[in-house]
From Swiss-Prot:
Tissue specificity of this protein: Expressed by the venom gland.
Modified residues (Pyrrolidone carboxylic acid): 1
Reported function: This peptide both inhibits the activity of the angiotensin-converting enzyme (ACE) and enhances the action of bradykinin by inhibiting the peptidases that inactivate it. It acts as an indirect hypotensive agent.
Single GO cellular component term: extracellular region
The protein's name in its UniProt record: Bradykinin-potentiating peptide AP
Amino acid sequence: QARPPHPPIPPAP
């Protein structure tokens, strides 16, 4: 089953 797209992950500092 295809998973729903996840929100973009912000770059770590």
